[in-house]
Amino acid sequence: MSSAVVSPVARLGPGVASRPGRRVSRAAKRHRLRASASVVVRQVAGEGDELVRKLKTCASVTAASFGPGRSDAVSVLDGLVRKIKYSGEAFVLLEAVEEDEEGGGDGACLGCADVTALPAFGPRASKEALVARVPMALGLTEQSNFAYLSGMCVDPGHRRRGVGVKLLEACESYARRMTPTPAVIALHVDGDNEAAIALYEGCGYVRVVEREVDDAFGRMSRAFGSLVGGGAKKILMHKWIKA
């Protein structure tokens, strides 16, 4: 979820990931948003042309959220198709939509997020460098599984309405229903995206480590539909969902 740059986030050194029960900072609590009752989050599903149409909508919203020069709808769409193809039932794409007058969720797409369940290690572990480092950063065991959240975005015209909160809550709910249940949800966020960091912290996510990441086209596309930047600093954040 993009925002104006206010000030850079201080570099964090590698550390041991905190366990459940860590207190959320007062600043994070002040940034917690009250979710709008008129927003519904649902899984993006379907077949054939119907599914393609829905994926294109999500791709367009994602591209608009990150802005010109950061992503484009075609690259985001390609990333989503790849995730569906290679991750199968371990992948879920969610969209936030506005309820219509009858209470149905058939309004405009306001935001998206996706979650992929991954083994911490082994032949089926992620091959994408950024994601592959998550298990070691969090101190996961060889038998552990984790959920990786990406593609989190809210349409610029619908921010500050609790859409992001509802998307995060839905991601956690779907992750808890995955088999085997992931021990933790992890995500990466740009170090200068203070609005997104505040949102995540307000929902219980904790920073782990910030590191330099090469955002060249192609490498990041495997993790998140081609974010084109230039040496952006990424902060790893996490939330334990299984004791």
Where are the model-predicted features located?
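Conserved acyl-CoA
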Residues: 138-143, 166-184
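Short hydrophobic/aromatic beta-strand element in the GNAT-like acyltransferase core
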Residues: 91-95, 112, 146, 151, ...
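N-terminal chloroplast transit peptides
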Residues: 1-28
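A short beta-loop-alpha structural element at the N-terminal edge
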Residues: 40-58
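Conserved active-site tyrosine of GNAT-family acetyltransferases
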Residues: 200, 205
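Conserved beta-strand-loop-alpha-helix junction that forms the acyl-donor binding cleft
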Residues: 150-159, 170-171, 181-197, 211-228
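Conserved acyl-donor/pantetheine-binding loop and adjacent beta-alpha core of acyl/acetyltransferases
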Residues: 102-151, 214-223
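Active-site rim helix/loop that mediates acceptor-substrate recognition in acyltransferases
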Residues: 62-105, 109, 114, 118-120
